[in-house]
Amino acid sequence: MALRAAQSAKAGVRAARPNRATAVVCKAQKVGQAAAAAALATAMVAGSANALTFDEIQGLTYLQVKGSGIANTCPVLESGTTNLKELKAGSYKLENFCIEPTSFTVKEESQFKGGETEFVKTKLMTRLTYTLDAMSGSFKVGSDGSAELKEDDGIDYAATTVQLPGGERVAFLFTIKQFDGKGTLDGIKGDFLVPSYRGSSFLDPKGRGGSTGYDNAVALPARADAEELLKENVKITKALKGSAVFSVAKVDPVTGEIAGVFESIQPSDTDLGAKPPKDIKVTGLWYAQLK
């Protein structure tokens, strides 16, 4: 019975999600994010089966959610308006902040001589565990149309791996940790921290770590300070920085729900400082509740 109910719930929203995708994409195009909108359109329509509202998700049992992919999606905002002026000026508490990626691209050098670097499409290798959820923070709206968004706490990072067309796999910690952005409701821009993909206690295959393990490769103690080996011996866990822009597409003044699209660029894993990071561009949807 639980499985049948879950299937019915998913089937009931298949017609609703494409409408939501169209509305969000049109809004993104309006604010000059045509490239992100094109990627979002394809991804959202293709993955529309599990879209549910916040109340519908809260009403599901564990067995209905298990194995369905619903846990990796953000709630749908079906009611409300695209007229952002309906959102009254003031300071709000941001709750149930959710970010659902729909596209991952990696900046790569051109294969042609003299070509420019560009973001290339990737194949997602991670299971459905990359959505950020249950985050909290603050949201401010000014009478002049200005807006501020800050993220404070929650499930704000997720280990993710993608594969490039050539087969190379790129690991990164998808996050918007401590995001602090300002702008307008059409585009709230800011920076965030990107913690190290691995912690200081992680040991590499030769037993070297940041806070534990060997100081150098045990077979080469005399060459521990050699330049070509130093970056492998000295482990760096310093947090890096990323940037993101959030665009509000729809608000519901009655329930306090808000939703839109986002785009972020962040560095990939550096193997504890042993290799330079790659730029990862993530686009997708976001949802939150204003209190």
UniProtKB/Swiss-Prot annotation:
Molecular function GO terms recorded: oxygen evolving activity
Coiled-coil ranges per UniProt: none
GO annotations of cellular component type: chloroplast thylakoid membrane; photosystem II oxygen evolving complex
Keywords of this entry: Chloroplast, Manganese, Membrane, Photosynthesis, Photosystem II, Plastid, Thylakoid, Transit peptide
Keyword Plastid assigned: yes
InterPro entries (alphabetical): OMP/PagP_b-brl (IPR011250), PsbO (IPR002628)
Locations listed in the record: Plastid, Chloroplast thylakoid membrane
Residue span of the annotated presequence: 1-52
Principal place of residence: plastid
Any GO BP annotation: photosystem II assembly
Pfam assignment, any one: MSP
Domain of life: Eukaryota
Similarity field: Belongs to the PsbO family.
Role: Stabilizes the manganese cluster which is the primary site of water splitting.
Designated name of the protein: Oxygen-evolving enhancer protein 1, chloroplastic
Source organism (scientific name): Chlamydomonas reinhardtii (Chlamydomonas smithii)
Lineage, highest ranks first: Eukaryota, Viridiplantae, Chlorophyta, core chlorophytes, Chlorophyceae
Protein's gene: PSBO
